[in-house]
Amino acid sequence: MTWEYALIGLVVGIIIGAVAMRFGNRKLRQQQALQYELEKNKAELDEYREELVSHFARSAELLDTMAHDYRQLYQHMAKSSSSLLPELSAEANPFRNRLAESEASNDQAPVQMPRDYSEGASGLLRTGAKRD
């Protein structure tokens, strides 16, 4: 009788194990699929970020090159306009505002501090203004 109980327990255990594996395995597969998708999305995000950084770095290089080339073109036009058109007055010359060498080599425009006052008196303190 003991062998019969052992055999019945073994069969019941195998059935319970098979059922548990069937339902438990589905959740495990879902978890593994989600984990794989998460890792794939993280890798894509990292790749996108690297691509974005390289794009902006290349754009900055191109803008610097373009600014340098523009300065060279402007200096060339200013030199050639003054040498080819010497009789043209300074006011009529479109390239009269020649860039200084120090300005041409400077990558940034000079920054002036903002003023915290206006040119003349305004508002109630203004003198000499007509009142209607």
Curated annotation (Swiss-Prot):
Residues 22-132 are cytoplasmic. Residues 95-132 are annotated as: Disordered. The keyword Membrane applies. One of its GO terms (cellular component) is plasma membrane. It comes from the Bacteria. The chain crosses the membrane at residues 1-21. Keywords: Cell cycle, Cell division, Cell inner membrane, Cell membrane, Cell shape, Membrane, Transmembrane, Transmembrane helix. One of its GO terms (biological process) is cell division. It is found in: Cell inner membrane. Its main location: membrane. Involved in cell division, cell envelope biogenesis and cell shape maintenance. Is a key regulator of cell envelope growth, playing a crucial role in coordinating cell width, elongation and division to maintain cell envelope integrity. Plays an important role in the lipopolysaccharide (LPS) assembly/transport. It may regulate LpxC levels and assist MsbA-mediated LPS transport. Forms homooligomers. Interacts with proteins of the divisome, such as FtsI and FtsQ, and of the elongasome, such as RodZ and RodA. Also interacts several other proteins, including the shape-determining proteins MreC and MreD, the N-acetylglucosaminyl transferase MurG and the lipopolysaccharide assembly protein LapA. It also copurifies with LapB and various proteins involved in LPS biosynthesis/transport and phospholipid biosynthesis. This is Z-ring associated protein G. The lineage of its organism: Bacteria, Pseudomonadati, Pseudomonadota, Gammaproteobacteria, Enterobacterales.
